[in-house]
């Protein structure tokens, strides 16, 4: 596991930012976990689970893989829309 840059910015004695989530229910039923906790650290127990992370407007569906461990949930749900220039015709 490679620690994320954000994970290193938090003091070691505080530990990772953990939010109580219904993990057992999600494992048994297979339902996605809806959360607004974008600052929660992804733990190894989350691998294989489906999350719906709030980006300020809607819930973005994400499935956790091993590469995501140590990162924050909010890193995978962008809050800003990409800008696309649309050219208009002058009449």
From Swiss-Prot:
This is Small ribosomal subunit protein uS19m. GO terms for molecular function: RNA binding; structural constituent of ribosome. GO terms for cellular component: mitochondrial inner membrane; mitochondrial small ribosomal subunit; mitochondrion. Belongs to the universal ribosomal protein uS19 family. Component of the mitochondrial small ribosomal subunit (mt-SSU). Mature yeast 74S mitochondrial ribosomes consist of a small (37S) and a large (54S) subunit. The 37S small subunit contains a 15S ribosomal RNA (15S mt-rRNA) and 34 different proteins. The 54S large subunit contains a 21S rRNA (21S mt-rRNA) and 46 different proteins. It holds the Pfam family Ribosomal_S19. PROSITE patterns: RIBOSOMAL_S19 (PS00323). Keywords: Mitochondrion, Ribonucleoprotein, Ribosomal protein. Component of the mitochondrial ribosome (mitoribosome), a dedicated translation machinery responsible for the synthesis of mitochondrial genome-encoded proteins, including at least some of the essential transmembrane subunits of the mitochondrial respiratory chain. The mitoribosomes are attached to the mitochondrial inner membrane and translation products are cotranslationally integrated into the membrane. InterPro entries: Ribosomal_uS19 (IPR002222), Ribosomal_uS19_CS (IPR020934), Ribosomal_uS19_SF (IPR023575). It is found in: Mitochondrion. It comes from Saccharomyces cerevisiae (strain ATCC 204508 / S288c) (Baker's yeast). Its main location: mitochondrion. One of its GO terms (biological process) is ribosomal small subunit assembly. PANTHER family: RIBOSOMAL PROTEIN S19P FAMILY MEMBER, SMALL RIBOSOMAL SUBUNIT PROTEIN US19M.
């Amino acid at each position: 596991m490679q620690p994320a840059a954000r994970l290193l910015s938090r003091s070691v004695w505080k530990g990772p930012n953990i939010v109580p989530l219904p993990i057992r229910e999600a494992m048994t039923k297979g339902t996605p976990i809806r959360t607004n906790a974008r600052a929660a650290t992804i733990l190894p127990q989350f691998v294989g689970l489906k999350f719906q992370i709030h980006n300020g407007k809607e819930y973005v569906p994400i499935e956790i893989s091993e590469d995501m461990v140590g990162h924050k949930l909010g890193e995978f749900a962008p809050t800003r829309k990409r800008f696309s220039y649309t050219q208009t015709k002058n009449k």
